[in-house]
Regions:
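N-terminal secretory signal peptides
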Residues: 21-74
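Active-site-proximal beta-strand/loop segments in catalytic clefts of secreted hydrolases
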Residues: 42-44, 76-80, 116-119, 157-158
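A cross-taxonomic marker for long C-terminal extensions/tails that follow the last structured domain
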Residues: 86-158
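Bacterial N-terminal signal peptides
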Residues: 5-16
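Short acidic/glycine-rich loop or secondary-structure boundary segments that cap or lie
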Residues: 48-50, 83-86
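Acidic helix-start/capping segments at beta-turn-to-alpha-helix junctions
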Residues: 71-85
Length: 158
């Protein structure tokens, strides 16, 4: 009897959660908008965290587009994140493949990925050593300032 009660409770909770998820949208925040612009400031030294950040950015882009609002995103990566973007680095191959896959998914959506040249120099990384689809810029702080001045919302991700 106790097991049956647990199963029923779990089923009800699951059904309730799926109905809540279907009802959620961003209509209030996005009302009256036809487009949005954001620059994501990414700083992490952990590859799984970077993958989570890339996934959140991808999903946010998709959700925005599904609500008929065009999204223009820039992902600005600096600091120790740069070391995670190097093609021929030591580490778990499967983890690196997932990172590359997420980079490709972001690129396919037209999301601009930038690597800080200041950090490249600091860590001794050449721009050509980065994964494909990542643009090297002089200094990501200038990108953050410039894009905000152009009306892009700053989204810290670390």
């Amino acid at each position: 009897m106790r097991i049956l009660a647990v199963i029923i409770f779990t089923f009800i909770a699951f059904i309730g959660q799926s109905q809540i998820a279907q009802a959620l949208d961003d209509a209030e925040a996005l009302s009256g908008l036809t487009s949005i612009r954001a620059i994501y400031d990414v700083r992490t030294k952990d590859e799984k965290t970077l993958q989570f950040i890339f996934t959140v950015i991808r999903d946010t882009y998709d959700e925005t587009m599904q609500q008929n609002v065009k999204a223009r995103y820039v992902v600005s990566m600096r600091g120790p994140t740069i070391k995670l973007l190097v093609r021929s680095r030591a580490g778990e191959a499967a983890l690196q493949e997932k990172t590359v896959g997420l980079i490709n998914e972001l690129n396919q959506r037209g999301i601009r990925l930038e690597a800080c040249g200041y950090a490249l120099n600091l860590f001794g990384v050449e721009p050509e050593d980065l994964y494909g689809g990542i643009v090297s810029v002089g200094n990501s702080l200038n990108s953050l300032i410039g894009y905000q001045t152009k009306g892009y919302a700053l989204i810290p991700m670390n």
